[in-house]
């Protein structure tokens, strides 16, 4: 199934079907604004083109056997951007998911939302919740959209919930462990990311899944998100397959 992922132009080898494909891939979608600026276009055009890449990469990841694809689409820090840009970005998931719902269903994709969703505009939350509900029975790849998400706030939120249980007398402070924190994160039902991909040449996490990526493999590329191709995705998977994950061992 995976041997169709060949870059016939430059001879790139296919993903190795005999080597582990990452179960959970997380991507920081970066470079939409720069993509548009390089072409003398408004930033919103870049964001719209970036949505097309989401369709392409979700389809590729699904066919490769990736189980969870988490996309960092809007962070808790992105609210400081111009209001017109924020409004446009938060309309995109609504338009994308509504138009793509038949394809998502046909490809057995399950959509999930991660983040402080109650702070999102009602129209955004309603649209994503609807698609999540209608795809809940699908058992193909999970498309996990991080909207209004921040890694630090995720940890703080989990810590507060654990503290509430201590106050209620459910357990003592000395009983708190990593598993308890993990059980109260937005990702409590998901495996930690095996591979993080970040586009646009930036070399930082930008407050994304800080707890969950303790042992994730990182892969950075200068390619801007709207230009990110299936071949680029294959390259990231190939690099991952060649690495040895030690988890602190030797």
Where are the language model's segments positioned?
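Flexible, compositionally biased loop and terminal segments
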Residues: 1-250
């Amino acid at each position: 199934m995976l041997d169709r992922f060949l870059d016939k132009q430059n001879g790139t080898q296919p993903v190795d079907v005999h080597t582990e494909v990452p179960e959970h891939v997380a991507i920081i979608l970066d470079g939409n604004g720069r993509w548009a600026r390089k072409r003398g276009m408004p930033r919103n055009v870049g964001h719209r083109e970036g949505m097309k890449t989401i369709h392409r990469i979700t389809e590729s990841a699904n066919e490769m056997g990736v189980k969870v694809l988490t996309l960092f689409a809007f962070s808790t820090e992105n609210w400081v951007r111009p209001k017109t840009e924020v409004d446009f970005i938060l309309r995109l998931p609504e338009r994308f998911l509504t138009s793509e719902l038949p394809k998502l269903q046909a490809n057995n994709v399950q959509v999930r939302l991660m983040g402080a969703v109650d702070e999102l505009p009602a129209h955004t939350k309603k649209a994503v919740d609807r698609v999540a509900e209608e795809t809940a029975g699908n058992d193909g790849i999970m498309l996990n959209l991080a909207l209004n998400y921040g890694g630090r706030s995720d940890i703080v939120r989990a810590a507060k919930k654990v503290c509430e249980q201590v106050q209620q007398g459910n357990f003592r402070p000395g009983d708190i462990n990593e598993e308890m924190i993990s059980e109260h994160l937005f990702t409590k039902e998901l495996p930690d990311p095996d591979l993080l991909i970040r586009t646009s040449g930036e070399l930082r996490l930008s407050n994304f899944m800080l707890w969950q990526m303790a042992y994730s493999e990182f892969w950075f590329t200068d390619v801007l998100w709207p230009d990110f191709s299936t071949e680029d995705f294959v390259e990231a998977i190939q690099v991952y397959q060649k690495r040895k994950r030690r988890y602190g061992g030797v």
